[in-house]
């Protein structure tokens, strides 16, 4: 018998969002881990807010929503609010009831700034790493470091001389006065003399010889070699020396004082970096750069089987950067300023680790999260 296409919808539903989400949905495991971490962060949240006044967006829901935005590659917070309004799965993950009103995007952004000031993303990331360590998913001896550029949320047209008081006037007859045509040919531009009027902390940099120069930030990842989890992250100005500075800083921040190995590509093969890494009790398993010069490491390092393993494992760090670009929405930045960019990059790394924990725990016999 053919069913009727009834257009009259019922006013009430007796099923909760919890009952609608499949028991084996990947977000369930991620939600469990996230809830445990947020419960541990409760005291930090309490210190961030006054005891009196109008209630804000609960920081737990705010952070869940931001994690969801990363996991589902939602391009903007406005689109996130739109999807929270009608997406049942998203409402369940964030903790919104079916009839609960979604926040205004401006209010959401203002509340996020409070989390930024308290460096909540860094604490959240640290607790995610702690969860992975509790499941014995991370090595504390073998690591890989790498860095790359992130294209800033600013165009080259905004890169102007620092002493230029007035905005560049559009040419007469320009068909688009709001986005005037600018000719850069013959103009010498550098970070010493020019600055972006859109994002003053973004610097002009290129990934390599012959590559296009773009306004960028420099992002860095310290990966443990057992399962490719992110052990630490850092974002610095793209000044040309940021890769080595960030690598040494992250190694110095590792807990304990036991010797470790540190895999890296040819960009880290310098006498100064190798010497400073060894001072930090890190054996530099860097790829040798013998082009036009002598490598900073020799057979005393490369002859060991561990060196070859490090060189094989270090390539996995590209999976992290790839995930952050395609899923995490970090191919081109949506935020401005070093602090906010670093905050979002740290939260994206935490989201990546959450996915890895869920996948690895599922693959382990009798694994649990």
Specify the residue positions occupied by each region the protein language model found:
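Helix-centered, glycine/charged polyanion-binding patches within enzymatic domains
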Residues: 166-169, 176, 181-183, 266-339, ...
């Amino acid at each position: 018998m053919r069913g009727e296409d009834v257009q009259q919808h019922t006013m009430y539903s007796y099923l909760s969002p919890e009952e609608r989400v499949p028991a084996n949905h990947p977000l369930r495991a991620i939600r469990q881990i996230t809830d445990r971490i947020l419960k541990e962060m409760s005291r930090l949240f309490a210190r961030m807010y006054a005891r009196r006044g109008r209630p804000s967006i609960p920081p737990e829901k705010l952070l869940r929503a931001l994690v969801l935005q990363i996991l589902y590659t939602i391009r903007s917070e406005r689109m996130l609010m739109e999807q929270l309004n009608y997406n049942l799965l998203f409402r369940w993950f964030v903790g919104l009831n079916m009839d609960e009103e979604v926040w205004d995007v401006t209010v959401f952004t203002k509340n996020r700034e409070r989390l930024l000031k308290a460096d909540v993303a860094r604490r959240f990331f640290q607790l995610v790493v702690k969860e992975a360590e509790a499941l014995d998913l991370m090595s504390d001896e073998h690591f890989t470091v790498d860095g790359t550029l992130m294209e800033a949320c600013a165009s080259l047209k905004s890169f102007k001389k620092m002493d230029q008081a007035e905005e560049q006037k559009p040419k007469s007859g320009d068909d688009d006065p709001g986005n005037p045509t600018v000719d850069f040919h013959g103009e010498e531009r550098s970070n010493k003399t020019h600055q972006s009027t859109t994002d003053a902390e973004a610097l002009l940099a290129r990934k390599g010889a012959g590559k296009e120069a773009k306004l960028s930030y420099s992002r860095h990842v310290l990966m443990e070699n057992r399962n490719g989890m992110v052990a630490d992250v850092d974002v610095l100005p793209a000044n040309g020396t940021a890769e080595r500075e960030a690598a040494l800083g992250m190694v110095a921040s590792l807990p304990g004082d036991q010797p470790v190995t540190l895999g890296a590509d040819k960009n880290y093969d310098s006498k100064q970096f190798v010497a400073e890494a060894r001072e930090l009790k890190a054996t530099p398993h860097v790829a040798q750069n013998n082009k036009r010069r002598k490598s900073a490491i020799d057979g005393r390092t490369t002859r060991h089987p561990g060196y070859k393993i490090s060189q094989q494992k270090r390539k996995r760090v590209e999976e992290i950067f790839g995930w952050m670009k395609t899923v995490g929405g970090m191919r081109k930045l949506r935020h401005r300023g070093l602090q906010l960019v670093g905050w979002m990059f740290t939260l994206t790394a935490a989201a990546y680790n959450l996915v890895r924990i869920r996948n690895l725990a599922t693959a382990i016999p009798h694994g649990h999260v």
